[in-house]
């Protein structure tokens, strides 16, 4: 019996167990695993049809990455293809998603894409690799729901309800999908489920005007400072129960030595809070684990597992250092304090280095290199808007990785 035949004769229970181990690493590796032979395919669970309702199949390591050069999702030159980037391995895949021909992107979370149909404002949650879709209420119902709770609703239009600070997706034991969205311009949280909901619901409470947010394990986390001289607080918003979303729960307080601008970012299995040191004229950054803050351990970390954090004012993202060979691990990419230029802050040494693409002139974000596109990726999902927001930020990374990938 040759080696190939031995693999084909594995017991189905063992194949299934190996498959779950592979899936814990990456969904697309699991798809390739199932394609090895008919036995392996029949012994493992097919992700199609379960891509949304079974959270094990959520492609969390994959982020939607625009092509650059103003080729936004839905552009005719892309022929329906969208590029995704694996934040753990650095691999790219292109998926053909015909829905983008008449849909626009509202947000993306855990590798899933929240879409708005332009014709009737229907909202859909899409799994880009299995094609599974969950139908959610039209976005126009969110406008009416907010109008019922706010006397100021007459000053808003639909565009104000399309700006999200964060989105979370959770799945109940019965397979009901709940989507929570944090409305950045309205300071409220809205939610809807896939269980036949006909309209979005809006929280009866609101947040303070300034915050940083992140989605993690189906919950929303908020970092905010209520007053100028108060310590920043971290709040947790749980999925709604019985059609009502409870107020944010205070779960941790950051020490006063962390100063704005703040950032929250999911990094591996942790949520990290980033801020500036309060020492006079200091350019140092401080990073705290949420788990440590909950235990009132206020010692900043000196390593982030070799990852690179992209701390943007809109969204922050963690990428494995293995996926970015031109970058040094344990680095934070963000605008320098008291400066509008992007820099690389090396956490272990406490030093800043410029991240400038010396071949370019001016301060527009580059559309041709990977690091720049990762940093700005949440600005350029929408085919109906400009590819990049104007900013005084120079281009990034070294000459040998400047070209389109």
What do the predicted segments below correspond to?
Residues 1-35:
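N-terminal Skp1-binding subsegment of the F-box domain
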Residues 15, 19-20, 29, 36-49, ...:
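General structural concept
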Residues 57-61, 88-89, 105-112, 168-177, ...:
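Short, solvent-exposed coil/turn segments at beta-strand boundaries
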Residues 79-88, 190-195, 232-239, 282-295, ...:
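Beta-propeller blade signature
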Residues 94-285:
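A sequence/structural signal of beta-propeller blade repeats
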Residues 149, 153-171, 294-388, 395:
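A surface-exposed beta-alpha-beta supersecondary segment
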Residues 245-337:
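Cytosolic regulatory protein-protein interaction regions
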């Amino acid at each position: 019996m040759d080696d190939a035949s031995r693999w084909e004769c594995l017991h189905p229970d063992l194949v299934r167990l190996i498959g779950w181990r592979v899936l814990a690493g990456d969904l697309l590796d699991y798809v390739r695993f199932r394609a090895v032979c008919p036995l392996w395919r029949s012994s493992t669970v097919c992700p199609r049809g379960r891509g949304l309702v079974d959270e094990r199949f959520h492609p969390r390591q994959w982020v939607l990455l625009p092509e650059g050069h103003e080729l936004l999702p839905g552009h005719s030159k892309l022929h329906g293809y969208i590029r995704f980037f694996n934040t753990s391995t650095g691999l790219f895949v292109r998926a053909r998603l015909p829905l983008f021909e008449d849909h626009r992107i509202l947000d993306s979370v855990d590798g899933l894409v929240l879409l708005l149909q332009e014709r009737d404002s229907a909202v859909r949650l899409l799994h880009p690799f299995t094609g599974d879709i969950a139908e959610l209420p039209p976005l126009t119902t969110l406008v009416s729901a907010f109008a019922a709770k706010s006397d100021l609703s007459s000053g808003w239009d639909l565009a104000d309800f399309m700006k999200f600070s964060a989105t979370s997706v959770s799945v109940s034991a019965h397979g009901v999908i709940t989507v929570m969205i944090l409305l950045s311009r309205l300071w409220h949280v809205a939610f809807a489920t896939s269980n036949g909901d006909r309209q979005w619901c809006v929280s009866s409470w609101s947040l303070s005007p300034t915050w940083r947010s992140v989605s993690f394990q189906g919950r929303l986390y908020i970092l905010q400072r209520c007053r100028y001289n108060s310590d920043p607080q971290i709040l947790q918003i749980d999925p709604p129960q019985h059609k009502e979303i409870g107020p944010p729960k205070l779960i941790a307080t950051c020490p006063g030595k962390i100063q704005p601008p703040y950032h929250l970012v999911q990094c591996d299995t942790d949520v990290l809070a980033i801020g500036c040191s309060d020492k006079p004229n200091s350019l140092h950054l401080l990073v705290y684990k949420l788990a440590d803050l909950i235990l009132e351990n206020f010692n900043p970390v000196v390593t982030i597992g070799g990852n690179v954090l992209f701390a943007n004012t809109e969204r922050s993202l963690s990428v494995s250092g293995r996926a970015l060979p031109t970058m040094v691990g344990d680095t934070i990419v963000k605008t320098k304090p008291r400066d509008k230029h992007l820099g690389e802050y090396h956490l272990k040494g406490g030093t800043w280095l410029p991240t400038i693409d010396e071949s370019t002139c001016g301060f527009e974000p580059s559309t041709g290199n990977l690091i720049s596109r990762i940093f700005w990726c949440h600005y350029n999902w929408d085919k109906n808007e400009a590819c990049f927001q104007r900013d005084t930020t120079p281009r990034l990374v070294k000459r040998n990785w400047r070209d389109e990938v």
